[in-house]
Structures are given as structure tokens and as C-alpha cells.
Amino acid sequence: MVNVSIARRYARALLDVASEAGRTDAVAEQLTAFADVIAKNAELTDVLVNPAYTREQRLRVVESVMQAIPGGVEATLANTLRLLVDRNRLGYLADIARLFRDMADARAGRVRGHVTSAAPLPADALAQLQQTLQQLTQRNVLLETRVDPSLLGGVSAQVGSILYDGSIRTQLEEMRRELKQR
């Protein structure tokens, strides 16, 4: 819980500064890209969180990763990342990135959702599903799609903390439970 509260403070401060500059979405994309690069490379992660490495070494790694991000990074994000190095808080980077994105979405009236289907959905079906979910939630819904053949058919959508499950697998499981009770 302490880790999340520390990450939340950094995420909120970065969001406030990025919002004032009108660069919230750009910072969100860059922060996510930076965190993804670090998360996907165990050696980079080790350098950034291992106390055996000096601050200067960590700062050089952070600067190198910032330069490797296409288009560079916003000054506010660069300063925040340097601050995380100075305060030995780089271990919270993944949480900061997630919380920043969630807070930015909340401020913009957006919510992220995940749609899972047995086969890839056609664009028109996905657009119709997105519109239906927006009507249900009264918010702008950003959907990510996944394919899971084990669903057998139908669609499962999670928006925020709410799960809308219309998959055939779930319907079969419910029928099995009902039959066992009789």
C-alpha cells in the first residue's frame, strides 16, 4: 500500500504539471513507452533498481532510454525521471505509469476496456460494441482487443471494474452449474 501511495504522489504531480502545459496525452504515451522499454529489459531494470549502481550510472541509463524514444520526451517527463533517479524511486516506475494513465483518463472522462472474443471482431462490430459500452458507462471508452479461442464464441468485455460476459463458455458453465443443482 505504501508503494502505491508513493507512486500516486509522483503520478499526480506529473499529471498536474503536464495538464498545465496541455501535454497530458503526449506525456502519457512517452511515460508508457519508457516504462515498457525498462520492463522488457531485465538488465536495464537491474541497473535502475539495484543499489550497487551509482546515481550517475542510473542517470546515464535513463538519459539513454529517453533519447531512444521516438521524438524524445517532454521536458516535464524528463525532469520527473531525473527526480526519480535522484530520490531512488525508479522501482515505482511501472506503478507511476499505470496510475498516471488512469488519472489522465479519469480527468478526460475516458475509461479503458478490454474486449475478448473467440475470433477477431470486424471493425463495424467493434465500433458498435464500443458505442454500446459508452452508452452503458456514460464515458468515452477506449477498447483493446484480444482473441481467446477458449471462449468458443461470443464476447467478453471488461470496462473499468465491470465485466460484461456474453461468451458461450460462460453460458455453458452457468448451464452446468444449474444442472448440477437439480
From Swiss-Prot:
Membrane topology of this protein? Peripheral membrane protein
**Which keywords are on file for this protein?**
ATP synthesis, Cell inner membrane, Cell membrane, CF(1), Hydrogen ion transport, Ion transport, Membrane, Transport
* Cell inner membrane as UniProt keyword: yes
| GO cellular component labels | plasma membrane; proton-transporting ATP synthase complex
Q: Write out the GO MF terms.
A: proton-transporting ATP synthase activity, rotational mechanism
Summarize the protein's role. Answer: F(1)F(0) ATP synthase produces ATP from ADP in the presence of a proton or sodium gradient. F-type ATPases consist of two structural domains, F(1) containing the extramembraneous catalytic core and F(0) containing the membrane proton channel, linked together by a central stalk and a peripheral stalk. During catalysis, ATP synthesis in the catalytic domain of F(1) is coupled via a rotary mechanism of the central stalk subunits to proton translocation.
Q: Assembly and partners?
A: F-type ATPases have 2 components, F(1) - the catalytic core - and F(0) - the membrane proton channel. F(1) has five subunits: alpha(3), beta(3), gamma(1), delta(1), epsilon(1). F(0) has three main subunits: a(1), b(2) and c(10-14). The alpha and beta chains form an alternating ring which encloses part of the gamma chain. F(1) is attached to F(0) by a central stalk formed by the gamma and epsilon chains, while a peripheral stalk is formed by the delta and b chains.
Record's family?
Belongs to the ATPase delta chain family.
Protein name per Swiss-Prot or TrEMBL: ATP synthase subunit delta
